Amino acid sequence: MKLLKYPFIFLLFLALVNCGKYEEGPGFSLLPKATRLQQKWRPIQFVDASTSVITEIEKDGSYLEFVKGGSLQYYNHDLMSFIGVAAATGTWEFSSDKTQVTVYYELMGLSSTNTYTINKLKINSLALIDEDGDKTYYEYF
């Protein structure tokens, strides 16, 4: 009977420690948040906070890549293709409670710093909310 008690307590502990912090999930994951975030993401949908208009994003090569160690690559086809830039590089970091991610990148001498609230962080899907409340959904690239 004692042998059954310890695995149950361990599973309960895991469930409490890994409870979902993000509104759209996951509720539980054994993978650390950084591991789930550190991959290449393709934007698939944009939701405007002020109008609630949902815009599907075409597969045009745009991506956001969070690299292990805190580096970042960002490419927005609509903004960067006409100036011939392959990608913007920068850095990223979690907030202390890992509910937000701050990205910093430079493009043609101009720097940009944005903080996004993580709404969803699954192994194959991500949703970020910007400072204006606009939400962008991403899928694993």
Feature annotation, model-predicted:
Residues 15-18:
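C-terminal motif of bacterial Sec signal peptides marking the signal peptidase cleavage site
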Residues 20-141:
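Lipid interaction determinants
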Residues 1-7:
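Bacterial N-terminal signal peptides that target proteins for export
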